[in-house]
Amino acid sequence: MPYCKLLAFLLSISSAQFAWCAASNEKPLLLRHPTISRTRIVFTFANDLWSVSRDGGDAVHLTTGIGVESDPIFSPDGSQIAFTGEYDGNIDVFVMPAAGGTPKRLTYHPSPDRAIGWTPDGKQVLFSSNRTSYSNFSRLFTVPAEGGPETQLPLDRAVEGSYSPDRAKFAYVPTDQWQRAWKRYRGGQTTHLAGHALRFERAENPAQQFE
């Protein structure tokens, strides 16, 4: 089943569960930030990461320590999970085995760093940060999954993004808008998609809008 269809199915199931819980006076659970591999679904609940089989069943804890975990993202081969962790007042990028284990910290900057993806080869984690922006705009960086120095992407500003399979092009969202959840919103703050040819360092903006 294609990922987009699976997400639509999960949302429909979630809505049905919510309605059932309301009818039976049970409290619904706020499950957020789903990421999907070929066999597992990882999500956040109560500031922790949880994992469940795509076929259904009981969810298991992946993180139980003191702190807040969010934004889990499977590596391309499904063996690792990158996520955003907030511990001791700082927000950084971490990576851990998909089956569970000790998280490895990848970023150490005092500015907030948030995991948003992987490079196609699964060797580096993509994250956003405002660490190099005096105007507080977010920019995108990569950091080796094994640890090491960060590399900034050649983009003036970006909050989300994804590589093409050959890593030659990059699609991204330049700025974040709170109206992004409005369907068919066409006002001045609507979110736009932009593309960047990484091999030639030539940017273009198709000004596409989310429907």
Name the predicted role of every residue range.
Residues M1-Y3:
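N-terminal secretory signal peptides that target proteins for export/translocation
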Residues K5-Q17:
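Bacterial N-terminal signal peptides
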Residues A19-S24:
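Boundary at the C-terminal end of the N-terminal hydrophobic targeting segment
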Residues N25-V52, D71:
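Beta-strand-rich domains and repeat architectures in extracellular enzymes and scaffolds
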Residues I36-R38, P76-D77, P120-D121, P165-D166:
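Residue-level detector of Asp-centered blade-edge/turn motifs that repeat once per structural unit
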Residues F45-W50, G65-E69, A82-F94, T102-R114, ...:
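A flexible loop/linker signature enriched in serine peptidases of the S9 family
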Residues H61-L62:
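Beta-propeller domains with acidic blade repeats across secreted/periplasmic ectodomains
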